[in-house]
């Protein structure tokens, strides 16, 4: 296994490319599962540098001004002061134009013909309103799936601390629960004989032992090792020094059994168990609840009140109804005492093994859960007691570790933490704050102008994601020619499947938390993203922000300003498509829906924004931020008969999702170009 040792040493010395090559050889010779995590670490480390390498190989003159400056700031390309200032001046000139205000007219927010007895269900009180989410699942026409409640797999990562681990295991022997559970001790290469401790409990617990070699602080890797060994559909992570109270398993499982879309967070208290052995806890089942609280040695994670350390999160739990009213709940997701459905590992990904120092990895993992649509809830009954190490002993320097991981966290968690940067200091980020998605089909004449308008925004923390939907013209070739090596542009090509499929593919390619929609023949005003982003930052509960547009011809000449309904209301959107370009929504809101409908060719956007309107509030900006090119081939003005049919279809499907059965949205006339409607009341036969 000398080849493996060589690979590990190369990785430690940051020679990632050679390390990757050797890890891949190990996979060929032995088993890919041995080095799967190592290969991923190398690929992650190489990702940004490879993008920069590609940029260096491409003529810098072809890259947009903002990207040049960001690469220069990151020392990826060399620019002298004169060159840099010239490019900054060019960028400011390109982005100087401000969006025009749209003409306003007085309107009623709720249409006058809206039925007086038709009430739309309330929206959530926050983006994390798990009570609202539970009620949404109960709606008659909402898709249901039978939960398989098989048990809880408890993963306990450990490095040494055999005595403390034994006490934690003893407390797991004392659980009062109707649910099955297993314990998986995941050893991060301890020097102490952890396996011997596990054997002590083989007759008392359903327990497993897994181990990896000591490669330094590898908490994420050892958590993943334990999670891969889990046999149940529900998993909990419990640090080895976190002794659970007797109702810990029951408190978690009785909630997970009701809703597997909620990740649960247990609070902690700080105690000293150094005067006890695990036998004391086996013989006195309530002992863990009786030991007095103390002041912790960990000055990073705790705060002191009344001569004892308290969990800093508890006050926030109380103020937000156990996080139900919190718009950033992932910030309180501490991996030492949590539980969730295992399905989320396959949706959001596993713990990020690039975190090799103390802190931050649980927030990053929690952010990915949140972005994917998971809810969070604190559970008082899942209290665990943090056992302080004797003599202030600690295997990791937490404060120093946090100084390192906070930088990685800022790179990988754009939402909430990330602030706007000035162009003079802006750099490329591992995970951008904003993604602009573009479904593209036969748009070779317009695609470069389209993409450049997205890159030349006053917000630079942004990427562009494109799905070429099997174009038969030069669209794909042009994308490859202009953007194959661009660090802020990603594109993919697929067989022609229609606008719904191309939109879904492009959105799934997006890494940002905020996602903007741009059609491939249109282009943005330079401040479009910033205007929307400002509204999102003012109100974290927003699911979507949209502006208005102007219609232009192929040459860019003004035809007319676009239709603009100046005030958003759910009732108006349920009656007519008022949510026009430019539109931005959160990735979380989109993940709470079924995505774009791939079975229809028209009214695809109307359907999508009705879905988004069902999961969160919208905000309208009365500014013209979007240029819509009318060339006769636009899907919204072709095949008017199908467009009309789908228009009424998607509204009625929205009503069905909302559990509204007493009204049907019906066309008033048979004319294809007519969108006049009537609310048809459906009499109940019962």
From Swiss-Prot:
Recorded catalytic activity of this chain's protein: 3-O-(beta-D-GlcA-(1->3)-beta-D-GalNAc-(1->4)-beta-D-GlcA-(1->3)-beta-D-Gal-(1->3)-beta-D-Gal-(1->4)-beta-D-Xyl)-L-seryl-[protein] + UDP-N-acetyl-alpha-D-galactosamine = 3-O-(beta-D-GalNAc-(1->4)-beta-D-GlcA-(1->3)-beta-D-GalNAc-(1->4)-beta-D-GlcA-(1->3)-beta-D-Gal-(1->3)-beta-D-Gal-(1->4)-beta-D-Xyl)-L-seryl-[protein] + UDP + H(+); 3-O-{beta-D-GlcA-(1->3)-[beta-D-GalNAc-(1->4)-beta-D-GlcA-(1->3)](n)-beta-D-GalNAc-(1->4)-beta-D-GlcA-(1->3)-beta-D-Gal-(1->3)-beta-D-Gal-(1->4)-beta-D-Xyl}-L-seryl-[protein] + UDP-N-acetyl-alpha-D-galactosamine = 3-O-{[beta-D-GalNAc-(1->4)-beta-D-GlcA-(1->3)](n+1)-beta-D-GalNAc-(1->4)-beta-D-GlcA-(1->3)-beta-D-Gal-(1->3)-beta-D-Gal-(1->4)-beta-D-Xyl}-L-seryl-[protein] + UDP + H(+); 3-O-(beta-D-GalNAc-(1->4)-beta-D-GlcA-(1->3)-beta-D-Gal-(1->3)-beta-D-Gal-(1->4)-beta-D-Xyl)-L-seryl-[protein] + UDP-alpha-D-glucuronate = 3-O-(beta-D-GlcA-(1->3)-beta-D-GalNAc-(1->4)-beta-D-GlcA-(1->3)-beta-D-Gal-(1->3)-beta-D-Gal-(1->4)-beta-D-Xyl)-L-seryl-[protein] + UDP + H(+); 3-O-{[beta-D-GalNAc-(1->4)-beta-D-GlcA-(1->3)](n)-beta-D-GalNAc-(1->4)-beta-D-GlcA-(1->3)-beta-D-Gal-(1->3)-beta-D-Gal-(1->4)-beta-D-Xyl}-L-seryl-[protein] + UDP-alpha-D-glucuronate = 3-O-{beta-D-GlcA-(1->3)-[beta-D-GalNAc-(1->4)-beta-D-GlcA-(1->3)](n)-beta-D-GalNAc-(1->4)-beta-D-GlcA-(1->3)-beta-D-Gal-(1->3)-beta-D-Gal-(1->4)-beta-D-Xyl}-L-seryl-[protein] + UDP + H(+)
Cofactor(s), names only, from the UniProt record: Mn(2+)
Source organism superkingdom: Bacteria
Function description: Glycosyltransferase that catalyzes elongation of chondroitin, a polysaccharide composed of a repeating disaccharide of N-acetylgalactosamine (GalNAc) and glucuronic acid (GlcUA) units, by alternatively transferring the GlcUA and GalNAc moiety from UDP-GlcUA and UDP-GalNAc to the non-reducing ends of the chondroitin chain. Each chondroitin unit has the composition beta-(1->4)-GlcUA-beta-(1->3)-GalNAc.
Protein name from the UniProt record: Chondroitin synthase
Presence of keyword Transferase: yes
InterPro entries named among the record's database cross-references: Galactosyl_T_C (IPR027791), Glyco_trans_2-like (IPR001173), Glycosyltransf_2 (IPR050834), Nucleotide-diphossugar_trans (IPR029044)
EC numbers: 2.4.1.175, 2.4.1.226
Location of the region described as Galactosaminyltransferase in the Swiss-Prot/TrEMBL record: 130-417
Binding site for UDP-N-acetyl-alpha-D-galactosamine: 157, 161, 188, 217, 223, 239-240, 361-362
Binding sites annotated in the UniProt record for Mn(2+) 1: 241, 386
Pfam families on file: Glyco_transf_7C, Glycos_transf_2
Similarity field: Belongs to the glycosyltransferase 2 family. CS/HAS subfamily.
Keyword Transferase: yes
Binding site for Mn(2+) 2: 521, 631
One GO molecular-function entry: N-acetylgalactosaminyl-proteoglycan 3-beta-glucuronosyltransferase activity
Temperature characteristics of this protein: Optimum temperature is 30 degrees Celsius for highest reaction speed, and 25 degrees Celsius to obtain highest molecular weight of product chondroitin.
UniProt remark on cofactor binding: Binds 2 Mn(2+) ions per subunit.
Organism: Escherichia coli
UniProt: UDP-alpha-D-glucuronate binding residues: 441, 469, 517-520, 581, 603-604
């Amino acid at each position: 296994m000398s080849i493996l040792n060589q690979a590990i040493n190369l990785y430690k010395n940051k020679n990632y490319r050679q390390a990757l090559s050797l890890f891949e050889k190990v996979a060929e010779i032995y088993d890919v599962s041995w080095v799967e995590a190592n290969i991923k670490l190398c690929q992650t480390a190489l990702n940004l540098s490879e993008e920069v390498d590609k940029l260096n190989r491409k003529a810098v003159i072809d890259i947009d001004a903002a990207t040049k400056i960001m690469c220069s700031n990151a020392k990826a390309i060399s620019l002298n002061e004169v060159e840099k200032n010239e490019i900054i001046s060019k960028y400011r000139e390109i982005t100087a134009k401000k969006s025009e205000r749209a003409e306003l007219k007085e309107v009623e927010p709720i249409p006058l013909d809206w039925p007086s007895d038709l009430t739309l269900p309330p929206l959530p009180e926050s983006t994390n309103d798990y009570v609202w989410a539970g009620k949404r699942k109960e709606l008659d026409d909402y898709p249901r799936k039978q939960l398989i409640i098989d048990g809880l797999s408890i993963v306990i990562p450990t490095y040494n601390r055999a005595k403390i681990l034994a006490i934690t295991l003893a407390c797991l022997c004392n659980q009062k629960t109707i649910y099955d559970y297993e314990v998986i001790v995941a050893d991060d290469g301890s020097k102490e004989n952890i396996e011997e401790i596990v054997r002590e409990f083989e007759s008392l617990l359903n327990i497993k032992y897994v181990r990896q070699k000591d490669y330094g602080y590898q908490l994420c890797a050892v958590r993943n090792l334990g999670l891969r060994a889990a046999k149940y559909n529900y998993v909990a992570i419990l640090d080895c020094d976190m002794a659970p109270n007797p109702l810990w398993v029951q408190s978690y499982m009785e909630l997970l059994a009701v809703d597997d879309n909620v990740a649960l967070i247990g609070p902690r208290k700080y105690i000293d168990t150094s005067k006890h052995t695990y036998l004391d806890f086996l013989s006195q089942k309530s002992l863990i609840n009786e030991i007095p609280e103390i002041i912790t040695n960990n000055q990073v994670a705790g705060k002191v009140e009344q001569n004892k350390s308290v969990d800093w999160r508890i006050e926030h739990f109380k103020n937000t109804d156990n996080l139900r009213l919190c718009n950033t709940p992932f910030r309180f997701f501490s991996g030492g005492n949590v539980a969730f459905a295992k399905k989320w590992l396959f949706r959001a990904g596993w713990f990020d093994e690039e975190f090799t120092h103390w802190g931050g990895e649980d927030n990053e993992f929690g952010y990915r859960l949140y972005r994917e649509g998971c809810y969070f809830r604190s559970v008082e009954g899942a209290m665990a007691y943090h056992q302080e190490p004797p003599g202030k002993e600690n295997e990791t320097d937490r404060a120093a570790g946090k100084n390192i991981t906070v930088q990685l966290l800022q790179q990988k968690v754009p939402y909430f933490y990330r602030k706007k940067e000035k162009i003079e200091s802006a750099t490329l980020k591992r995970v951008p704050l904003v993604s602009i998605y573009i479904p593209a089909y036969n748009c070779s004449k317009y695609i470069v102008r389209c993409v450049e308008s997205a890159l030349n925004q006053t917000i630079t923390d942004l990427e562009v994601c494109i799905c070429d939907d099997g174009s038969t013209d030069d669209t794909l070739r042009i994308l490859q020619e202009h953007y194959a090596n661009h660090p802020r542009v990603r594109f993919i090509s697929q067989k022609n499947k229609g606008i719904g499929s191309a939109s879904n593919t492009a959105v799934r390619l997006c890494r940002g938390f905020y996602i903007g929609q741009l059609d491939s023949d249109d282009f943005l005003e330079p401040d479009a993203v910033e205007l929307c982003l400002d509204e999102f930052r003012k109100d974290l509960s927003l699911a979507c922000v949209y502006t208005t547009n102007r219609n232009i011809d192929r040459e860019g000449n003004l035809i007319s300003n676009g239709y603009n309904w100046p005030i958003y209301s759910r009732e108006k959107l349920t009656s007519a498509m008022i949510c026009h370009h430019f539109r931005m929504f959160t990735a979380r809101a989109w993940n709470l829906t079924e995505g774009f409908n791939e079975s229809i060719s028209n009214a695809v956007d109307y359907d999508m924004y009705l879905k988004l309107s069902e999961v969160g509030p919208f905000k309208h900006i009365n500014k013209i931020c979007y240029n819509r090119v009318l060339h006769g081939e636009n899907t919204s003005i072709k095949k008017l008969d199908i467009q009309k049919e789908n228009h009424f279809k998607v509204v009625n499907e929205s009503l069905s999702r909302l559990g509204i059965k007493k009204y049907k949205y019906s066309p008033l006339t048979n004319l294809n170009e007519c969108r006049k409607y009537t609310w048809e009341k459906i009499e109940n036969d019962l």
